[in-house]
Amino acid sequence: MSNTAKKSSRRETRAAASEYIYNLTGQPFPNSHKVYVEGTQNNIRVGMREITLSDTYIGGSDENPVYEPNEPLRVYDTSGPYTDPNFKLDVRQGLAKFREQWIESRGDTELLESVTSRFTQQRMADEGLDHLRFEHLPKIRRGKAGKNVTQMHYARQGIITPEMEYVAIRENMGRKKIHAELLAAQHKGESFGASIPDFITPEFVRDEIARGRAILPNNINHPETEPMIVGRNFLVKVNANIGNSSVSSSIEEEVEKMVWSTRWGADTVMDLSTGRYIHETREWVVRNSPVPIGTVPIYQALEKVNGVAEDLTWEIFRDTLIEQAEQGVDYFTIHAGVLLRYVPMTAKRVTGIVSRGGSIMAKWCLAHHKENFLYTHFEDICEILKQYDICFSLGDGLRPGSIADANDEAQFSELRTLGELTKLAWKHDVQVFIEGPGHVPMHMIKANMDEQLKHCDEAPFYTLGPLTTDIAPGYDHITSGIGAAQIAWYGCAMLCYVTPKEHLGLPNKEDVKEGLITYKIAAHAADLAKGHPGAQERDNALSKARFEFRWHDQFNIGLDPERAREYHDETLPQESGKVAHFCSMCGPKFCSMKISQEVREYAKDLEARGIDPANAADTITIKMIDVEAQMKAKSDEFKKTGSEIYHKAI
């Protein structure tokens, strides 16, 4: 009976996902709409979310109230066309290839007659897979012979590409339009040596990419992506992981999770599928993704040898790279730093090697007693990646899986090797970022950032958390969010989210949202701490709305308007609760902000009476004297009328 129930539940989940993705409409957030800022070259239109705010009541009478308008607030938006009702969405067709013209105009790529990966050729010839296939497959593009088509290569030639101008506009989020002094106010941050400018220019973007301090992940076979940038001098980014396994999920569910992730703020998405139909799932995901897609190619290579790590070969892995490059994957996690001599260093760990990719390569090294073929063939991998503009995400295969193992010899030995490989990739003008831990207690986190900056020459750092304690299964989005905020403040450029299901199971749609909101909080907190220009505008706008009891604006400015509204309405569901000058926590008589407003009004009254309210002590004393005088007058009145509670009507 239980098996039947399980099957029914999985069918229902898949059916719900199908219903969602096949009936998508551009659904904006409440009181929000898409605005597009135009660039100077090649039809650049950068989408942002603009939140319309209600007016502030500033006085007047009940009959003639006086209001002051609040200017709209622009926020960074990762959702692409999925929140724009003006776009016709059809996942069977995929998204518009708006970068295609930019790629073609450079003249350094060519269209191939057909796919060149042997594995893809076999899949295409299998008619049994026709019902799963993405129908409208694009033509494959590759760099012409002898051409390097990476954004780093262009940057080092002094070329500002449309993609670079796009991200400059995107990072600034229309801040020049902000006129309110209150919204622009910001605390001075501590950036720990970062070089964050007041305003991001296309030239600054070019220079950061040329120096290797930032990456712009955009495979030429993924023209549907909206360009974004990862680097310590830019806004902190967040990655969401999706992916099926041999026991869970379907193509429909993974596409749903990708779309859902971009709605809730995923700057990139990693497809970590390990089950059946990896190739077909990835095609659907890439064709419908407005954000860069990353993968761990060794996972699929392992599937091709039936899960036997010892049977992996360079030839199988190389074909997997080409297969995924031709599909449009934007960055590859490559565990090239797991060297044979480092594996014994993990023997005394509490949790050993916890990285899937790391454990696969460690097993291969020990079985053959040879050096990691990802390391020995690293320059061959560079040659492939620069033909498609794919970024290296150098994997931390020896990351600590428990706080007991944090910052040990194995972890930092691998990190030093990743630094060497970074410089080798840069010789080929291939973009690189570095993956980091893991499980690290708070007092040991900064050492990770310092070591990474030292050995990897400021290449962007990308960490999974880190988790700051191991005692909270089911709440590891919180244990890791703490560490994520901290390491991002120190300079980590992108955070890989952790969901409540970490260590327990594959996340569902709601887990994805929970993890993303947690990590958007961590990323934003780090931007504030670094003093990133404009980071505080959203906080200021929400605080102003909160003080003025503009409840709808409070909900809509927040990261999760749905939950904020839901929590408020649990106790004050009526529409009158949305204009009330209190919430259910304090009630009408004890609301600190309501009392603060009354104090402000009282200060205005004092000014009108010629009393300086700047002297707080005098103000409080005067108010107390006024209150005491009024109370005494009422007491005298009560006594004069006979000290009776009730009186007969006259």
UniProtKB/Swiss-Prot annotation:
Binding site residues for Zn(2+): H439, H503
Recite the UniProt keywords alphabetically: 4Fe-4S, Iron, Iron-sulfur, Lyase, Metal-binding, S-adenosyl-L-methionine, Thiamine biosynthesis, Zinc
Single GO biological process annotation from the record:
thiamine biosynthetic process
The biological pathway it contributes to is:
Cofactor biosynthesis; thiamine diphosphate biosynthesis
Coiled coil, from the record: none
**A cellular component annotation (GO) from this entry:** cytosol
Q: What is its EC number?
A: 4.1.99.17
Keyword Lyase annotated: yes
* Keyword match 4Fe-4S: yes
Quote the InterPro entries the UniProt record gives. Answer: ThiC, ThiC-associated_dom, ThiC/Bza_core_dom, ThiC/BzaA/B
Q: Name one GO molecular function term.
A: zinc ion binding
Q: How is the cofactor bound?
A: Binds 1 [4Fe-4S] cluster per subunit. The cluster is coordinated with 3 cysteines and an exchangeable S-adenosyl-L-methionine.
- The residues that hold substrate are N241, M270, Y299, H335, S355, R356, G357, D396, G397, L398, R399, E435, Y462
Question: What are its cofactors?
Answer: [4Fe-4S] cluster
What this chain does, per the entry, is described as: Catalyzes the synthesis of the hydroxymethylpyrimidine phosphate (HMP-P) moiety of thiamine from aminoimidazole ribotide (AIR) in a radical S-adenosyl-L-methionine (SAM)-dependent reaction.
The record's comment on protein family reads: Belongs to the ThiC family.
* Annotated protein name in UniProt: Phosphomethylpyrimidine synthase
Q: Per the UniProt entry, what species is this protein from, by scientific name? A: Pseudoalteromonas translucida (strain TAC 125)
Organismal lineage: Bacteria, Pseudomonadati, Pseudomonadota, Gammaproteobacteria, Alteromonadales
